[in-house]
From Swiss-Prot:
Similarity comment: Belongs to the UMP kinase family.
Protein's pathway: Pyrimidine metabolism; CTP biosynthesis via de novo pathway; UDP from UMP (UMPK route): step 1/1
Protein name: Uridylate kinase
Classification via CDD domains: AAK_UMPK-PyrH-Ec (cd04254)
E.C. number: 2.7.4.22
Keyword Amino-acid biosynthesis set for record: no
Enzyme class label: transferase
Catalytic activity: UMP + ATP = UDP + ADP
Annotated compartments: Cytoplasm
Top-level taxon: Bacteria
Gene Ontology BP annotations: 'de novo' CTP biosynthetic process; UDP biosynthetic process
GO molecular function, one term: UMP kinase activity
Phylogenetic lineage: Bacteria, Bacillati, Actinomycetota, Actinomycetes, Micrococcales
Organism whose genome encodes this protein: Leifsonia xyli subsp. xyli (strain CTCB07)
Protein backbone atom coordinates (compact mmCIF):
# COMPACT_ATOMS: atom_id res chain seq x y z
CA UNK A 1 0.00 0.00 0.00
CA UNK A 2 1.43 3.39 -1.01
CA UNK A 3 1.13 6.53 1.09
CA UNK A 4 -1.43 7.78 -1.43
CA UNK A 5 -3.56 4.68 -0.77
CA UNK A 6 -3.25 4.85 3.02
CA UNK A 7 -6.57 5.45 4.69
CA UNK A 8 -7.10 7.86 7.56
CA UNK A 9 -6.93 6.01 10.91
CA UNK A 10 -8.83 7.47 13.87
CA UNK A 11 -9.45 6.63 17.50
CA UNK A 12 -13.00 7.56 18.49
CA UNK A 13 -13.76 8.04 22.19
CA UNK A 14 -17.44 7.65 23.11
CA UNK A 15 -18.86 8.47 26.53
CA UNK A 16 -20.72 5.75 28.38
CA UNK A 17 -23.39 8.24 29.46
CA UNK A 18 -24.37 8.67 25.81
CA UNK A 19 -25.18 4.96 25.61
CA UNK A 20 -27.67 5.24 28.43
CA UNK A 21 -29.33 8.47 27.31
CA UNK A 22 -28.97 9.78 30.86
CA UNK A 23 -30.26 6.54 32.40
CA UNK A 24 -28.60 3.47 33.89
CA UNK A 25 -27.82 0.77 31.31
CA UNK A 26 -27.93 0.77 27.50
CA UNK A 27 -30.59 2.51 25.40
CA UNK A 28 -30.82 0.37 22.22
CA UNK A 29 -32.23 3.19 20.08
CA UNK A 30 -29.36 5.54 20.95
CA UNK A 31 -26.62 2.93 20.50
CA UNK A 32 -28.16 1.80 17.21
CA UNK A 33 -28.09 5.39 15.93
CA UNK A 34 -24.45 5.87 16.96
CA UNK A 35 -23.53 2.56 15.30
CA UNK A 36 -25.18 3.55 12.01
CA UNK A 37 -23.21 6.81 11.96
CA UNK A 38 -19.93 4.99 12.58
CA UNK A 39 -20.70 2.32 9.98
CA UNK A 40 -21.33 5.01 7.33
CA UNK A 41 -17.70 6.14 7.62
CA UNK A 42 -16.12 2.70 7.96
CA UNK A 43 -15.64 2.13 4.23
CA UNK A 44 -13.40 5.21 3.96
CA UNK A 45 -11.71 5.39 7.38
CA UNK A 46 -9.96 2.92 9.70
CA UNK A 47 -11.86 3.23 12.99
CA UNK A 48 -10.87 2.14 16.49
CA UNK A 49 -13.14 2.98 19.42
CA UNK A 50 -12.79 3.37 23.18
CA UNK A 51 -16.08 3.43 25.09
CA UNK A 52 -16.59 4.77 28.60
CA UNK A 53 -18.63 2.98 31.24
CA UNK A 54 -20.32 5.87 33.03
CA UNK A 55 -23.81 4.55 32.26
CA UNK A 56 -23.03 1.62 34.57
CA UNK A 57 -20.31 2.62 37.06
CA UNK A 58 -17.83 5.43 37.67
CA UNK A 59 -14.94 4.26 39.80
CA UNK A 60 -14.01 7.71 41.09
CA UNK A 61 -17.60 8.41 42.20
CA UNK A 62 -18.00 5.01 43.86
CA UNK A 63 -14.73 5.51 45.75
CA UNK A 64 -16.04 8.84 47.10
CA UNK A 65 -18.86 6.83 48.70
CA UNK A 66 -16.37 4.68 50.59
CA UNK A 67 -15.67 1.86 48.13
CA UNK A 68 -12.07 0.80 47.52
CA UNK A 69 -10.92 2.82 44.48
CA UNK A 70 -9.19 -0.09 42.75
CA UNK A 71 -12.23 -2.36 43.06
CA UNK A 72 -14.55 0.45 41.95
CA UNK A 73 -12.40 1.10 38.87
CA UNK A 74 -12.49 -2.59 37.92
CA UNK A 75 -16.29 -2.46 38.10
CA UNK A 76 -16.16 0.52 35.73
CA UNK A 77 -13.92 -1.45 33.35
CA UNK A 78 -16.46 -4.28 33.21
CA UNK A 79 -19.11 -1.69 32.36
CA UNK A 80 -17.04 -0.62 29.35
CA UNK A 81 -16.98 -4.23 28.13
CA UNK A 82 -20.78 -4.39 28.28
CA UNK A 83 -20.95 -1.18 26.25
CA UNK A 84 -18.38 -2.56 23.78
CA UNK A 85 -20.44 -5.69 23.18
CA UNK A 86 -23.62 -3.65 22.71
CA UNK A 87 -21.88 -1.40 20.20
CA UNK A 88 -20.40 -4.41 18.40
CA UNK A 89 -23.84 -5.93 17.97
CA UNK A 90 -25.39 -2.77 16.54
CA UNK A 91 -22.39 -2.11 14.28
CA UNK A 92 -22.72 -5.59 12.81
CA UNK A 93 -26.45 -5.04 12.32
CA UNK A 94 -25.43 -1.90 10.36
CA UNK A 95 -23.16 -4.02 8.14
CA UNK A 96 -19.76 -3.28 9.70
CA UNK A 97 -17.30 -6.07 10.51
CA UNK A 98 -16.19 -5.59 14.10
CA UNK A 99 -13.81 -6.96 16.72
CA UNK A 100 -13.74 -6.29 20.47
CA UNK A 101 -10.42 -6.41 22.30
CA UNK A 102 -10.42 -6.39 26.10
CA UNK A 103 -7.58 -5.28 28.39
CA UNK A 104 -8.95 -7.77 30.96
CA UNK A 105 -8.90 -11.28 29.57
CA UNK A 106 -12.37 -12.72 28.92
CA UNK A 107 -11.88 -14.98 25.95
CA UNK A 108 -15.53 -16.04 25.65
CA UNK A 109 -16.60 -12.53 24.59
CA UNK A 110 -13.52 -10.63 23.34
CA UNK A 111 -10.01 -10.98 22.02
CA UNK A 112 -7.17 -9.97 24.34
CA UNK A 113 -5.74 -6.52 23.65
CA UNK A 114 -2.90 -7.05 21.16
CA UNK A 115 -1.91 -3.81 19.35
CA UNK A 116 -0.45 -5.47 16.24
CA UNK A 117 -3.55 -7.63 15.83
CA UNK A 118 -5.71 -4.52 16.21
CA UNK A 119 -3.72 -2.85 13.42
CA UNK A 120 -4.23 -5.86 11.14
CA UNK A 121 -7.98 -5.75 11.79
CA UNK A 122 -8.03 -2.05 10.90
CA UNK A 123 -6.08 -2.66 7.69
CA UNK A 124 -8.67 -5.29 6.72
CA UNK A 125 -11.50 -2.79 7.15
CA UNK A 126 -12.75 -4.01 10.53
CA UNK A 127 -13.79 -1.66 13.31
CA UNK A 128 -11.93 -2.41 16.55
CA UNK A 129 -13.52 -1.63 19.92
CA UNK A 130 -11.22 -1.51 22.94
CA UNK A 131 -12.94 -2.56 26.18
CA UNK A 132 -11.97 -2.77 29.86
CA UNK A 133 -10.06 0.50 29.86
CA UNK A 134 -6.35 0.04 30.46
CA UNK A 135 -6.95 -3.05 32.58
CA UNK A 136 -5.55 -1.05 35.51
CA UNK A 137 -7.21 1.18 38.12
CA UNK A 138 -6.74 4.97 38.23
CA UNK A 139 -6.74 5.36 34.42
CA UNK A 140 -9.69 7.20 32.86
CA UNK A 141 -11.06 6.10 29.50
CA UNK A 142 -9.91 9.49 28.10
CA UNK A 143 -6.35 8.49 28.98
CA UNK A 144 -6.87 5.01 27.51
CA UNK A 145 -8.13 6.60 24.27
CA UNK A 146 -4.93 8.66 24.00
CA UNK A 147 -2.72 5.66 24.80
CA UNK A 148 -4.48 3.32 22.34
CA UNK A 149 -4.34 5.97 19.61
CA UNK A 150 -0.58 6.26 20.06
CA UNK A 151 -0.07 2.51 20.10
CA UNK A 152 -2.04 1.82 16.91
CA UNK A 153 -0.48 4.89 15.23
CA UNK A 154 -3.78 6.73 14.69
CA UNK A 155 -3.84 10.09 12.93
CA UNK A 156 -6.11 11.76 15.48
CA UNK A 157 -8.12 11.19 18.67
CA UNK A 158 -11.77 12.15 18.22
CA UNK A 159 -13.60 12.76 21.50
CA UNK A 160 -17.39 12.71 21.08
CA UNK A 161 -19.05 14.67 23.88
CA UNK A 162 -22.59 14.37 25.14
CA UNK A 163 -24.38 17.70 25.64
CA UNK A 164 -21.52 20.01 24.58
CA UNK A 165 -20.14 20.74 21.09
CA UNK A 166 -16.46 21.37 21.83
CA UNK A 167 -14.10 22.86 24.40
CA UNK A 168 -15.10 26.08 26.18
CA UNK A 169 -13.24 28.50 28.45
CA UNK A 170 -15.80 27.62 31.16
CA UNK A 171 -18.61 25.10 31.59
CA UNK A 172 -21.33 26.19 29.11
CA UNK A 173 -23.93 24.24 31.07
CA UNK A 174 -23.50 26.53 34.08
CA UNK A 175 -22.10 29.70 32.48
CA UNK A 176 -24.14 31.09 29.55
CA UNK A 177 -21.25 33.46 28.70
CA UNK A 178 -18.73 30.64 28.23
CA UNK A 179 -16.82 31.03 24.95
CA UNK A 180 -16.27 28.14 22.57
CA UNK A 181 -12.66 27.57 21.50
CA UNK A 182 -12.08 26.55 17.86
CA UNK A 183 -8.39 25.68 18.20
CA UNK A 184 -5.91 25.55 21.09
CA UNK A 185 -2.62 23.86 21.89
CA UNK A 186 -2.52 20.95 24.33
CA UNK A 187 -0.18 23.01 26.52
CA UNK A 188 -2.50 26.01 26.65
CA UNK A 189 -5.50 23.80 27.46
CA UNK A 190 -3.53 22.30 30.36
CA UNK A 191 -2.35 25.74 31.50
CA UNK A 192 -5.93 27.06 31.53
CA UNK A 193 -7.09 23.89 33.31
CA UNK A 194 -9.85 23.31 30.75
CA UNK A 195 -11.95 20.32 31.72
CA UNK A 196 -13.33 18.80 28.51
CA UNK A 197 -10.89 15.86 28.75
CA UNK A 198 -8.64 14.75 31.56
CA UNK A 199 -5.18 16.23 32.00
CA UNK A 200 -3.34 12.91 31.71
CA UNK A 201 -4.87 12.31 28.27
CA UNK A 202 -3.95 15.83 27.18
CA UNK A 203 -0.37 15.40 28.44
CA UNK A 204 0.04 12.10 26.57
CA UNK A 205 -1.15 13.69 23.34
CA UNK A 206 1.01 16.78 23.86
CA UNK A 207 4.17 14.79 24.59
CA UNK A 208 3.69 12.61 21.50
CA UNK A 209 2.34 15.10 18.97
CA UNK A 210 -1.11 13.49 18.74
CA UNK A 211 -3.87 15.89 17.64
CA UNK A 212 -7.24 15.67 19.37
CA UNK A 213 -10.62 16.93 18.21
CA UNK A 214 -13.46 17.40 20.69
CA UNK A 215 -16.94 17.61 19.16
CA UNK A 216 -20.60 17.15 20.03
CA UNK A 217 -22.46 13.94 19.23
CA UNK A 218 -25.48 15.99 18.17
CA UNK A 219 -27.02 16.78 15.77
CA UNK A 220 -27.33 13.49 13.90
CA UNK A 221 -24.54 13.09 11.37
CA UNK A 222 -21.84 14.72 13.52
CA UNK A 223 -20.10 11.42 14.33
CA UNK A 224 -19.91 10.45 10.66
CA UNK A 225 -18.69 13.94 9.73
CA UNK A 226 -15.95 13.94 12.38
CA UNK A 227 -14.77 10.48 11.34
CA UNK A 228 -14.53 11.65 7.72
CA UNK A 229 -12.44 14.67 8.73
CA UNK A 230 -14.92 17.54 9.11
CA UNK A 231 -13.49 20.47 11.07
CA UNK A 232 -16.16 20.63 13.77
CA UNK A 233 -15.80 21.24 17.50
CA UNK A 234 -12.37 22.11 18.92
CA UNK A 235 -8.97 21.04 17.59
CA UNK A 236 -6.16 20.54 20.10
CA UNK A 237 -2.68 20.20 18.71
Amino acid sequence: MTMADKRRRVLLKLSGEAFGGGQLGVNPDIVSGIAREIAQAATDVEIAIVVGGGNFFRGAELSQRGMDRGRADYMGMLGTVMNSLALQDFLEQAGAETRVQSAIEMIQVAEPYIPLRAERHLEKGRIVIFGAGAGLPYFSTDTVAAQRALEIIADVVLVAKNGVDGMYDDDPRTNPDARKIDQISHQEALKQNLKAVDSTALSLCMDNGMPMRIFGMEPAGNVTAALLGAEIGTLLG
